[in-house]
Amino acid sequence: MAAAASEKGLKLLGITEHAPGIPGTCSPIYFRNLHVVPRRIYGVELLLGAELNIIDYKGTIDLGEEYFPMLDIRIAGIHSLCYKPGTVEQNTEAMIGAIRNPHIHIISHPGDGTAEVDFEPIVLASKEHHTLLEINNSSLNPVRKKLTARDNNLTILRLCKKYEVPVILGSDAHISFDIARYDHIYELLQETRFPEELILNDKVEAFKKFIGR
C-alpha cells in the first residue's frame, strides 16, 4: 500500500482496517501491534488506525477506548454486517452519536445507503463536533449497486458547501491499485461546484491539525 501511494505521489496515507464487529476481520491483537510499524515507508507518512463499526442507535462503537491511544486515526461507520437499520430518526441518531464521540475523526461513507438517514442534522453535527464526513469513491462505483449513493453524496456535498463544512475524499482502497482513486467522486464535485478549499486531501498539515496529529 505504501509503495503504491509513493508511486502516485502521495505524502500521507491512512490505513484503517475494519474493527472486530465485522466477521473475519482484524482481532484486537492486530491493533495492539500497530506500534511496530514504521510511520514512514517509501517516503510516505502513514496514519494507521481502525474503521470502527457503529453497532446501535446510540452510536456505540465496537472497540474499547483502551485501544484508542494505539490508533493514529479513528473512523466510524455503519456496516450491514453489524448494524440493523431502524427508522430514519434512529439511524440518524446512531450516526450523530458517533460524531459526538470525541475520539472519532471521520465518519466513513455516510452516504452509501446502508441505513437511511437525514443528512442535514448529520452535517451540522459534524461541523459542531469537528468530525469529518467522508465522500467515498467505492460507494459510487456502479458494480457496488449502492442505488442511493449518488443522490446521497450529492446531498452531503451540497449541505457541506452551504454550511462550509470540510470533507475528506476516500478511495476505500481494499487493494493497492485503488489508492487515490476518486474517479466517481469528481463528477459530483463538478456538479455541485464544491469549493476546493473544503477538501482536505491535498492539505496535509491542515488535515493533520484537524485530527489532532
What are these language model-derived features?
Residues 61-62, 69-166, 173, 179-180:
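Domain-core and long-helix interface of multi-subunit machines
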Residues 188-193:
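Aromatic-rich peripheral "rim/lid" segments of glycoside hydrolase catalytic domains that contact
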Residues 177-180, 185-187:
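Active-site-adjacent betaalpha module
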Residues 1-56, 62, 66, 106, ...:
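An N-terminally biased module of ancient metal coordination in phosphate/nucleic-acid-related enzymes
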Residues 155-156, 163-165, 185, 207-212:
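Accessory recognition modules or surfaces
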